[in-house]
Amino acid sequence: SVVSAHAAENVIEEVVVTAGSSIQQRLGGSGSGTVLTAKEIQQVGATHASEALNRVAGVWVNRGSGQEHLTAIRSAVLTGSGACGEFSYLQDGIPIRPHGFCNINNLFELNTEQAAAVEVWRGPASAVLGGNALHGAINVITPVPDRSVIALEAGAYEFGRISLQGGVEQGSHRLGATFVGANSGGYRDDSGYGQQKLSLSHLTEVSGWAVRSHVTATLLNQETGGYVRGEKAYEDSDLRTTNPNPEAYRDAWSLRLNSEWSRDAWTLKPYIRRSQMAFLQHFLPGQPLEENDQSSIGMIVERGLSTAT
């Protein structure tokens, strides 16, 4: 009926974000923050993180070939080593790279497509989040679905995507899973990509501690498009779809395990991180092949301070 349809439109979706997963409470008034809700993220249906993040004031994520990008948060668009340490990318309040390690394209390792929320922090945050947050930070909150959803999409240039999510609750345990897989032939010659992201979540209570645990894995296999060169090349419509570097590629995977134990004013967040990438640097003389990887383990300990008088 019209009444029930109107009522459904006015239902406000509730998204629960714990204090431990969020960076807003930790940063306080040191900058300016914006939160993209799950509803906003779903409405955008972004095929690249830039399509959602560029809705945030003071943010510009410049899309490169495939899933590559360059980020600006109240700053210039920084490239190469100049972008290292400028922005911190986090999942559930935990940086996805150790301090001092950098990949300026890190957003493709975060499941922004199915996030419970995405927090964007504008302004210096290195004192709280570590040395990788000179200009700001982007934090993705992992969802724990309570219902099953299957979505299929198709688009131009051989684009296809499948999104799955589901959850189950048994006693004091709640389990959730999300998966998104996308393939594209690319707008230009030999510039397609295949990308998959999987998250598994578990919520429970242990001796008075509220426990949230997540396992996240990502995989990207990308054929990279090189720069089209030539005077006024932009005026030649035939050049727009060409790729002068069909040999260029970027293959990357990541695996993260993290947990959040909260009780009273205390929050403990142990984590394990592993990532590996190989990509042909077609933009440099000699086209060197870069291969990098990192493994790290740690724990963040937080204690809230009461301001009551």
Each predicted region: which residue ranges?
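Short, acidic, small-residue-rich periplasmic hinge/interaction motif at the N-terminus
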Residues: 6-42
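Hydrophobic, lipid-facing positions within transmembrane beta-strands of outer-membrane proteins
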Residues: 13, 69, 134-136, 150, ...
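Non-catalytic regulatory/gating segments with a bias toward low-complexity or hydrophobic composition
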Residues: 41, 53, 118-119, 138
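Extracytoplasmic beta-strand/coil segments of soluble accessory domains associated
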Residues: 50-94
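Short strand-turn segments of transmembrane beta-barrel domains in outer membranes
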Residues: 86, 124-125, 136-137, 142-168, ...
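Short acidic/polar hinge/loop motifs at secondary-structure boundaries
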Residues: 94-122, 140-141
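Transmembrane beta-strands of outer-membrane beta-barrel pores
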Residues: 154-158, 168-172, 181-185, 206-208, ...
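Flexible loop and strand-edge segments within Gram-negative outer membrane beta-barrel domains
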Residues: 184-191, 195, 210-258, 275-293
